[in-house]
Amino acid sequence: MTLSLRFTGAEVLRPGGLDRAPLSIAGGKIRDGGGRNVDLSGFIILPGIVDIHGDGFERHLAPRRGAMKDIGAGLVAAEAELAANGITTAVLAQFYSWEGGMRGPEFAHLVMEGLAGVRADLVTDLHAQLRVETSMVDHYGAIAAFITAHRIGYVVFNDHLPHEALEAGKRPARLTGQALRIGRNPEKHLAMMQTLHEGMHRVPGALGKLSAQLARAGVIMGSHDDRSACARDRWRSLGARIAEFPETVEAAEAARAGGDAIVMGAPNVVRGGSHNGNASAPDMAAMGLIDALASDYHYPSLRRAAFLLADAGLHDLAGAWHLVSKGPATVLGLADRGDLAPGQRADLMVVDSRTRRVAATISGGRISYLAGAAAARMIG
């Protein structure tokens, strides 16, 4: 059941900036007026967050290594965390990888089946992204069928093979631990990696065919961890128009020059830079080289990152919040959300103006999270 409410007294972040005019919702949409009055003085109402890439849901599916929960129950728990952090639309980034375990094809099937089973019972709008390892050429047919069967609308291409070590005939770092963690013999794991590495010459031709097939089906495509302008240009030629977490300013600038969307990690902003020496998200924001921020592995970072960028003067609040709302919605082609304009989905979050803690989250006009004084006022 959707709410019919008229919020008064709060600061409201609309497309033109903050104001104190009332905000009404009804029928799952932002409306021009009407609804039961709710005084939210002392709070700020912001567009609901759109998380364009996050794998933080994984820990709800396996709280401890090897301790798999019921997938559906785990996704319900993940939604609770999303809602508590003001996220109204979330893209679950699921691997389809030779790495096995929670990144393997079998687990990807379980996640998609679990999502299909609980989606109708959730308030947060959940979408799936498939992270495809380009080296798995022999799986491309199965991957295309998987994408079609599960109606996946967003695919990102990755390559996590340690090519430098494999080319030099060295044993990749941490190989034994990684293999044992997924129940695979380390020597067989190494042999598989070597076989995939040796078959990389097959990737360009096969990837061209796969990307063309996905493009015809209307699938949005992106690449992960671009390191150079050349790499970004190559991905653009294949129709992968999203640069997800480019590792260098050069790659990001190439994306901007080519009209591609740039996604960076919100934890990178919260930390003040990359944890592994890659491009700094705050610097990229200052240069105008970010279209959307993603939670990556930490859902609370989205809200914190937007406020940090505004506090640092790199954006005003409207510009900073755009990176976690309208920006990612636009990249995903979700034109019905991301701002608090009449006619848009009633996706919003309410934060305490003093502490900036989330007090309420509403997705599609339905409450997904409610706490404290805001709860007392809405219920009352």
Q: Which role fits each region the language model picked out?
A:
Residues A10, V324-K326, T330-V331, L340-G380:
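C-terminal cap of metal-dependent C-N hydrolases
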Residues L130-G141, D225-A229, R234, I242-E244, ...:
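Active-site glycine- and acidic-residue-rich loops that bind
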Residues A149-G153, W235-I242, A257-V263, M287-D291:
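Glycine-enriched alpha-helix->loop->beta-strand junction motifs that scaffold or abut catalytic
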Residues S97-D226:
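Metal-coordinating catalytic core of metallo-dependent amide/deamination hydrolases
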Residues G48-I52, A90-L92, L126-L130, G153-D159, ...:
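Hydrophobic faces of well-ordered beta-strands that scaffold small-molecule active sites
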Residues M1-R6, E11-L46:
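Histidine-rich, glycine-flanked metal-binding segment
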Residues L40-V111:
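Metal-associated gating/positioning segment near the N- to mid-region
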